[in-house]
Amino acid sequence: MKYVYPAMFYKEEDGRYSVLFPDFDVATCGNDLNDAMNMAVECLALQLVGLKRDGDPFPVSSPVDTVDPVAYAEELGAGKPSDYFVNLISVDADEYAKLHFNKSVRKNLTIPVWLNEKALAQGINFSQVLQEALMERLQA
């Protein structure tokens, strides 16, 4: 499922961009606008995946017209920004997690010869059985 939240982009004096998400009180940055956009997607995805993992609710997305980058910057003590904008960032947190967090790792295991032979004879996928057993054990 896609989620959409507003992000405030501030251009820094050195040309880099700071990005703040008012609904989460998290921030990221990028070397240029393209990098900042990519980092904003990653930041939002990480935040949503973390909330979901912890069983915490997602905050309600603020309407774009209620987000005030000037007031937010002044509240942080940064003064009035000269170059800024608000943009909506959209991310499918589940899909992002699958692509970036659910990578497989190779594990070696030791089992008795007789068990190995029986499993091979039945065409059992060792990786799948191990994953299923671990998932079941971790949910218990």
Which role does the model predict for each range below?
Residues D35, R106, N125, V129:
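Amphipathic alpha-helical recognition patches that constitute DNA-binding helices
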Residues K2-V4, A45-N108, W114-Q122, A140:
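Short, charged, surface-exposed hinge/linker loops at domain edges
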Residues V19, A36, G55:
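Hydrophobic pocket/interface hotspot
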Residues F126-A140:
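Short, basic amphipathic alpha-helical segments that act as recognition/interaction helices
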Residues F24-D35, N108:
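A short, exposed loop/beta-hairpin motif centered on an aromatic-Gly-Thr core
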Residues D35-L46:
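A short, charged, amphipathic alpha-helix used as a generic interaction element across diverse proteins
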Residues F9-D23:
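Short aromatic-glycine-(Arg/Gly/Cys) micro-motifs in beta-strand/loop hairpins
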